[in-house]
UniProtKB/Swiss-Prot annotation:
Conditions for induction: Down-regulated in response to LPS (lipopolysaccharide) challenge.
Name of the protein: Surfactant-associated protein 2
Biological source species: Mus musculus
Subcellular location: Secreted; Cytoplasmic vesicle, Secretory vesicle; Golgi apparatus
Main location: secreted
Post-translational modification (record): N-glycosylated.
Glycosylation sites: 61
Cellular component annotations (GO), alphabetically ordered: extracellular region; Golgi apparatus; transport vesicle
Role according to the record: Putative surfactant protein.
Amino acid sequence: MESLMRLFLLLALLSSSHAGPKVTLQVKLTETFQDKTSQNSSALDMLQKICLLLHLPSGTNVTLLHKGPPHYLTCRA
C-alpha cells in the first residue's frame, strides 16, 4: 500500500495546471496489482481515490486500461 501511495504522489507532481486542457498519464502496474483491479468494485474504488488524491476537477474522465475490459469513471466534486 505504501508503494501505491508513492505512485499517487508522483502522479500528483506530474499533473499540473501548466500541462494544458488535456493530460494523459500512463502508468505501468505490476501483475499483482492488475490482478487486484480485475474486480469492478476495486477498480472503481481505485479510480475514485485517484480523483481525490490528484484533486482532479469535477467532470474529469479517468480510464483504467489493463488486460481485462477498461474501467471508466467521471470525477465528481
